[in-house]
Amino acid sequence: MIEADRLISAGATIAEDVADRAIRPKLLAEYVGQPQVRSQMEIFIQAAKLRGDALDHLLIFGPPGLGKTTLANIVANEMGVNLRTTSGPVLEKAGDLAAMLTNLEPHDVLFIDEIHRLSPVVEEVLYPAMEDYQLDIMIGEGPAARSIKIDLPPFTLIGATTRAGSLTSPLRDRFGIVQRLEFYQVPDLQHIVGRSARHMGLEMSDDGALEVARRARGTPRIANRLLRRVRDFAEVKHDGAISAEIAAQALDMLNVDAEGFDYMDRKLLLAVIDKFFGGPVGLDNLAAAIGEERETIEDVLEPYLIQQGFLQRTPRGRMATVRAWNHFGITPPEMP
């Protein structure tokens, strides 16, 4: 199973990236959710503008699909500067990064997605650029090689990552601002779904937006993807208007249940409950039981189930929680 094949995957496709650009908020005033992040960034941005400085370097981390790229765009818009975008895997050589840095205007924002995937060679070039606004470049090879320094304009580096723990300490320590994005609350997702529906010219009730939000796994990217599929269903099977009933019918047809679980989530939980009496069960046995790789279970299926309290990791293996039993209407066994 490939994560990108799942309707409730938090990863983005190229087509979705293009479609989502039109409905992304442009300013902090339009930004929904993440209240602590929003209030802090308002102060940091206003203070930088009052001083006439570039904003401090910013690290944004958290699960995929929560709006790290959106926040980077908002920062650039609020500061009134250009945004240059790249990603860690694209910057293969030091010269790739040097080319981007030397083309920045004063106070511009350089956004590096997946910054945890920077190569050590590129990362070494980034240190003096972040700290001293200087670029150290080696000219020539062998005994004739020499280092030259190029002054850079003050700029803001925004790094985004889903794996903050994978960053090296020297890189992490050079960010003056660090923001963690959390999963969204249902009321905030409902607001996002309603806003997206209006941008798409859809007729959607508040209850319809709520139904989509409940099944979106706390993730705006998933909410917008589900909204597009509900729109398709409403246009073909009904008159295009989206009520709670129509949204529920569409999502049930797509095998996304009330908790936002898809077929694979339910298959894993039911395997633990039915085949292993609720667990504990070892990872290898569980992988064999559902026909998946253990890495798929660890990296793709488990995290959300554990976070939502449906699955436990114990020293003896995986166990279904009482909440998992109740989700399927099965009476949990008596605790000894």
UniProtKB/Swiss-Prot annotation:
One of its GO terms (molecular function) is four-way junction helicase activity. This is Holliday junction branch migration complex subunit RuvB. Residues 185-255 are annotated as: Small ATPAse domain (RuvB-S). Residues 4-184 are annotated as: Large ATPase domain (RuvB-L). Homohexamer. Forms an RuvA(8)-RuvB(12)-Holliday junction (HJ) complex. HJ DNA is sandwiched between 2 RuvA tetramers; dsDNA enters through RuvA and exits via RuvB. An RuvB hexamer assembles on each DNA strand where it exits the tetramer. Each RuvB hexamer is contacted by two RuvA subunits (via domain III) on 2 adjacent RuvB subunits; this complex drives branch migration. In the full resolvosome a probable DNA-RuvA(4)-RuvB(12)-RuvC(2) complex forms which resolves the HJ. Residues 258-336 are annotated as: Head domain (RuvB-H). Has 3 domains, the large (RuvB-L) and small ATPase (RuvB-S) domains and the C-terminal head (RuvB-H) domain. The head domain binds DNA, while the ATPase domains jointly bind ATP, ADP or are empty depending on the state of the subunit in the translocation cycle. During a single DNA translocation step the structure of each domain remains the same, but their relative positions change. One of its GO terms (biological process) is DNA recombination. It catalyses: ATP + H2O = ADP + phosphate + H(+).
